[in-house]
A protein has these predicted regions:
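Nucleotide-activated donor-binding/catalytic signature segment of Leloir-type glycosyltransferases, i.e.
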Residues: 272-297, 304
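N-terminal subdomain of nucleotide-sugar transferases
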Residues: 1-68, 250-253
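A short, active-site helix/loop in glycosyltransferases that binds the activated sugar's phosphate group
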Residues: 55, 62-64, 170-205, 212-214, ...
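Nucleotide-sugar-dependent
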Residues: 243, 293-295, 305-326, 335-346
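Conserved donor-binding/catalytic core segment of Leloir-type glycosyltransferases
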Residues: 4-6, 212, 225-243, 249-252, ...
């Protein structure tokens, strides 16, 4: 068996270069960590694999400074090779360039008619799946499994995507992706309910929930915002109303303990709202976008981490927030609402408010932060243990590999 992992990860050797050439110096940290978790799992399971990456970047000249994304090749282990394709980043030409290079690299790999090839695609982007579908048509020994982390319909939740003409192109992309589902042999989902929106996945899916990728975090950042005489809550994620951060900030503002601090990392349409609240309440610290390593350090040093998303939108039934695994693995206790996409067993390790009101969240903040330090430490450690032992890269990728061979 040979595995080809089609991804959008950033090779570590050129990650700095890619970040520097993004107009906003912003790389997609959460998807990158998930994908490197898959790669490390393939390495640990000693699988013969090609990691084929088309780094997730914006187009030139609006979002990326270079006309062409540089190629990079490396050997990650005896069995695993990495090819990060170089492609044309110019707006309008990018999809065709990526599609052509994907097809070229995969066709060069699937040369043995007696070998079974399993392509695991992290993305459902249509121009990344299109060349695989064409290759499958002429190679009976090539099989396609797709990791679905989010439903394509969710793209329209972001305000920037709701404007014309972007909305038109996104709707067309959604239609194309749904047509491509019929060509996918197996689906790897983060929530069992996703099959309600992807009927093609019924009877041929594996629910993964998430993956804990043990990052090599160096204590390279001075955490001056976290002090031993203060109780710090951390939120790191998208700064959008649907994420619940606006309401959580309002709930925090209703608390009065001067030793409380709320650190917020991220970017999005609610930044102006958060910045205004930070002016009104000096306990709120808005950091904006931050490097992933810095965020991980903050998670481990904070008193409490929070996912403030509420179950008042359909998306929460069909998703498993990536931060859940990362937060619970940090050893820091977590507070959040009951979301349908998260199995009930996770909530034994979390604090949850009594209802969805801002007042209830404010009361829960006071309740949790009033608990003795040893109770909070015990809560965090009990949550951490099963994540690190059962959701680590080797275990989760092992499940995927067994599923592919069923």
């Amino acid at each position: 068996m040979k595995v080809i992992f089609l991804s959008g990860l950033y090779p570590k050797a050129i990650e700095g270069l890619l970040s520097e050439n993004c107009r906003n110096n912003y790389l997609q940290n959460a998807p990158n960590e998930f994908q490197w978790g898959i790669v490390d799992g393939l390495i640990q399971n000693k699988v013969s694999a090609l990691i084929l990456s088309c780094p997730f970047l914006g187009t030139y000249p609006l979002h990326f400074k270079l006309r062409r994304v540089p190629e990079y090749r490396a050997s990650l282990s005896k069995e695993v090779q990495l090819v990060s394709i170089g492609y044309n980043a110019i707006m309008g030409l990018k999809p065709l360039s990526i599609e052509r290079h994907i097809r070229k690299e995969i066709e060069a790999c699937v040369t043995d008619d007696n070998e079974e090839y399993f392509i695991i695609a992290y993305s459902t982007i249509s121009y990344m799946l299109a060349p695989i579908i064409k290759i499958k048509a002429s190679h009976q020994n090539v099989h396609l499994a797709t990791i679905v982390t989010d439903l394509v319909d969710n793209a329209l939740l972001f305000k920037d995507n709701q404007k014309y003409p972007k909305r038109f192109f996104i709707n067309r992309e959604i239609e194309t992706i749904k047509e491509q589902y019929s060509y996918i042999d197996k689906f790897i989902l983060l929530s069992a309910a996703m099959t309600e929106k992807i009927p093609a996945a019924i009877g041929k899916n594996k629910v993964l929930e998430g993956i804990w990728h043990e990052s090599d975090i160096q204590a390279s950042h001075n955490l001056t915002d976290i002090k031993s005489d203060q109780k710090t809550i951390l939120y790191a994620g998208t700064i959008q109303p649907f994420a619940g951060i606006n309401d959580f900030v309002d709930a925090f503002a209703k608390t009065s303990n001067p030793s409380y601090r709320l650190i917020i990392c991220g970017a999005g349409s609610s930044e102006a709202y958060i910045q205004q609240k930070a002016k009104e309440d000096s306990r709120i610290i808005f950091k904006g976008r931050q490097p992933h390593q810095y965020v991980i350090q903050l998670q481990r040093a904070a008193t409490l981490v929070v996912n403030p998303r509420k179950p008042d939108e359909e998306i929460t039934r069909y998703s498993f927030p990536s931060k859940t695994i990362e937060y619970l693995a940090s050893g820091t206790p977590m507070i959040g609402y009951h979301l349908e996409g998260i199995p009930s067993e996770y909530y034994t390790h979390m604090f949850t408010p009594t209802d969805l009101s801002i007042e209830a969240m404010a009361q829960e903040i006071d309740h949790v932060l009033s608990l003795p330090t040893h109770i909070l430490k015990e809560k965090g450690e009990k949550a951490q243990a099963p994540i690190q032992s059962e959701k680590n890269s080797k275990a989760q990728v092992g499940k995927i590999l067994r599923f592919l061979q069923e």
